[in-house]
Amino acid sequence: MRFTKALILFLIVFSGFSTIAAQDDEVIKVDSSIVRLNVGVVDAKGRPVTHLNKENFTVYEDGVKQDILSFAPTVTPFSVVMILDMSGSTLGFRETIRQSAFRFVDALAPEDRVAVIEFYDKVNLRNDFTTDRKRIANSIVAANGRGKTQLYKALDVALAKLSNEGKRRKAIIVLTDGVDTSARDIDRNFLEKYKGAEITTALKPETSEILNSILNKSDAKGVTIYPLALPTGDPFKLADPTPMQIAMFAAARNRLQILADRTGGTLNTINRLEEMGRLYAAVAADVRALYTVEYQPTNAKRDGKWREIKIEVSNPELISKTRQGYFAK
C-alpha cells in the first residue's frame, strides 16, 4: 500500500512538470483578437476583494504591458452552466449532490443565469439559461441516470450553450470524478504497449486531444471552469489497483487540474461527501468575486505560439488569479 501511494504521488507531480511543454505543440484558435480574462483577487488571508476598479489592474502579455479595453466589476451578472455527474459511480449519493447543488444556486446573485446539464451515457440539457430559481431547482431534482461518464462531451455541450450568451461573463461548474469513459479507453489502449515501471511515466495527461479540444474552446470564449472532484475518482481510494489503473485515475485527476489552471478556475477536491455543500457554496462565492478584463494584444501575430498572461493589482499585498495564457492562432 505504501508503494501504491508513492506511485500515485509520483504520477500526479510528474505530469504537472510537463504541462506547458506539451502545450507548445497545441494550437488554440481564438475567434477574436480580443482576450477576455476573469480575474479573482484575494487578500493575504484568502478573503475576496471586490471593491477594485479598472485603474487597479495591469495586464501583461509575454512581459509587455497591455491596454485594458473594458472592465466589468464583480457585481456584473454571470451565465453559469452547472454540470452534474449522473453516471453509475454517483448512484449512492444523489441526494447529497442535489442538496449541494441547491446551496450553489442559492449563493448566486438573482441576475445570474443558470443552465443545468446532466451526463452519464448521454448528455442532457435539463434547462437552458434562466434566472427562474424554481425551474433550476426542478432540473436539479429531476437529474438522474447511470452508466458511463461522458464528461468531456458534457463540457463541449456547455461551451456551445455559452456561445449564445453574447458578452455576458461565463463560467462552468462541473461535478465529476473526472474518469471520462472515452479518455479512459484511449489511455488504456495507449498503456497496453508498456510494461512494468514504464507504465508510470508513459501517460502524459496534458496531451489528450479530448482535453485540449475543450481548452481551445474555453480559451476562445473566455470561460472559467471550476471542477469539483468526487472521491470516487481519487486514485488513493482504489482497492488493490494495478499500475495501469493508478496511471489512468491519476491522469484523469490531473486533467481536472489542468482544466482549472488553464481557464483561471480552481479544482476543489471533495474528500468526504459531507464537504460537498460547503465546497459548492465556496465556488459560488469565488464566481461572485470575479472581475472581467478585456484587452487587444499589442502582438498581432497569429503564429500559433504560446502567449503568457500575467495580471497585477496596484496593492502588492493582494493576490490575483486568472488563466495562464493562450495560443495565438
Regions found by a protein language model. Give the residues of each.
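N-terminal secretory signal peptides that target proteins for export/translocation
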Residues: 1-3
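Residue-level detector of intrinsically disordered, flexible termini
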Residues: 5, 20-21
